Amino acid sequence: YIYDRNGILLADNYPVFTATLSKADIEDMDDTVKRLTPIINLTEDDINGFNSRVKASRKTERVTLKLNLTEQDIARFSEVKFQFPGVEIETQMTRYYPHGELFAHVIGYVGRINDKELKSIDKDSYAGTNLIGKIGVEKSYEDLLHGFPGYESIEADAHGNILRHLGRKESTRGNDLYLSLDYGLQSIASEQLAGRRGAIVAIDPRTGEILALVSSPSFNPNLFVTGIGHADYSALRDNLDQPLY
């Protein structure tokens, strides 16, 4: 979690339902994805991201197809689950920024791990998550904020029956981070820039701490967490006021 200097929550974690596929249990991955598309409303971005993750994953890994399934997605899949061996609905933690645009330029956001990042990270440390810090505080303090997944090793026979448990390691949650920013001052600075282009930085002259850092216009970082759609990204990218910068 990320907090301001007074303990106000700036970046939260919450559980979402995700569709994952087992490479070991699915012979025709493309056909499975095609049949799942109308059931859980897969977009082109969902499919392209999944294909990239499949190529970079190991044979024994489960690969996330879609994050943040709706209740309707889950209900439709539940009715036909027997037709999709190797496909499961799981719960994963994802990031949420409760104040939206207010801290976007300083906190940044997390997003799905891309092909370049997959080559540089320790895959074991990121098992069970698809998210990594992209910009701002989230990227600068990724190593501190990111926890470590747990695991259980077992020995099984050819039919999947467990013969014995070989070992278990509990997961470790990431560290909390307290910033020098002050939510109240950040809000006042944002109000002063409402409807205008510009930036405000407030610094405590005694300590050098940054108390507020606002750039206007801003953007909603929550759009990037589960994968921003093409239309939303184009609107931000092509905006003459350049909210992403």
Residue ranges and their predicted role:
Residues 1-245:
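Periplasmic/cell-envelope proteins involved in peptidoglycan metabolism and beta-lactam response
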